[in-house]
């Protein structure tokens, strides 16, 4: 379970970075060269999703829970926004959903 969660976390970071770099280019006028590492990051994101032993739809559903938590960590530490009780509650619910789905991988 820990290995799966860490792999999902790495996957989420790749997805967020791959989307954040073009955002910097479009919204903040950063160099278009950021699109190169963004493309690499998104390709790595896709590859990491293929490393899980479950059906793709089940992997995507479980990944969503970790993505929510990772995005909120990004909000806190990159964007500098303090998380609310609603943020923490939503993250906990999403993570519980992920844990339930992953726990059932071998039983489905």
From Swiss-Prot:
Keywords: Cell inner membrane, Cell membrane, Membrane, Transmembrane, Transmembrane helix. Disulfide bonds: none annotated. Pfam families: UPF0060. InterPro entries: UPF0060 (IPR003844). It is a multi-pass membrane protein. It comes from the Bacteria. The keyword Repeat does not apply. GO terms for cellular component: plasma membrane. SUPFAM superfamilies: Multidrug resistance efflux transporter EmrE. Belongs to the UPF0060 family. This is UPF0060 membrane protein CKO_01576.
């Amino acid at each position: 379970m820990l290995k799966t969660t860490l792999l999902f976390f790495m996957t989420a970071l790749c997805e967020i970075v791959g989307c954040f770099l073009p955002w910097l280019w479009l919204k903040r006028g950063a160099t278009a060269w950021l699109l190169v590492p963004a493309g690499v990051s998104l390709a790595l994101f896709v590859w990491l999703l293929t490393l899980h032993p479950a059906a793709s739809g089940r992997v995507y559903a479980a990944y969503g829970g970790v993505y929510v938590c990772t995005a909120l960590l990004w909000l806190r530490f990159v964007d500098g926004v303090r998380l609310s009780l609603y943020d923490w509650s939503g993250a906990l619910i999403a993570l519980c959903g992920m844990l339930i789905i992953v726990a059932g991988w071998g039983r489905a």
